[in-house]
């Protein structure tokens, strides 16, 4: 944020979080319980939705075929990455690239809208002044879904601030 600017600052990347900066101090309203219980609108959450959509046969057939071609979807391979390897949240987030690539397809559009709405209501709207200050974002999910994010924020009369892919970009 510009120096001493009051703002809500959010992360939408592999994981997600949100805080309020009063110009001097960062305030956290929602205590994160980690990627399994929290992380609305994160790469790991989108990866989880895509895998479930695929395995529960909710994903459109053509999209499912392409998903199979791009990823190893063998159950044993997936379970190994989720339960035996470190950072299962990062593994799940690798599927977010597919979602971003297909963000204009109805199946992915619905997932994106649902998760963004959840993030806005569960995180951003916790702060009473969420309509008065800009909301800045950092992370690849926010960066690559900036247009969708802006539409969702506008729906709730929330002002989108800066959107950066990585902290170093600022």
Residue locations for each model-derived region?
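Phosphate-binding/catalytic loop of phosphoryl-transfer enzymes
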Residues: 1-65
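ATP-binding/phosphotransfer module of carbohydrate and carboxylate kinases, centering on a glycine-rich
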Residues: 2-8, 51-170
């Amino acid at each position: 944020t510009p120096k001493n600017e009051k703002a809500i600052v959010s992360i939408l990347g592999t994981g997600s979080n949100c805080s309020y900066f009063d110009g001097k101090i960062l305030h956290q309203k929602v205590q994160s319980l980690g990627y399994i219980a929290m992380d609305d609108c994160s790469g790991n959450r989108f990866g989880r939705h895509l895998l479930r959509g695929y395995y529960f046969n909710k994903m459109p057939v053509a999209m499912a075929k392409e998903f199979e071609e791009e990823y190893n979807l063998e159950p044993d391979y997936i379970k190994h990455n989720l339960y035996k390897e470190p950072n299962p949240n990062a593994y799940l987030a690798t599927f977010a690239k597919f979602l971003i690539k297909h963000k204009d397809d109805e199946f992915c559009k619905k997932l994106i809208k649902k998760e963004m709405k959840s993030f806005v209501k569960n995180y951003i709207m916790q702060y009473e002044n969420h309509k008065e200050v800009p909301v800045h974002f950092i992370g690849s999910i926010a960066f690559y879904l900036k247009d969708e994010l802006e539409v969702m924020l506008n729906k709730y009369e929330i002002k989108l601030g800066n959107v950066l892919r990585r902290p170093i970009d600022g």
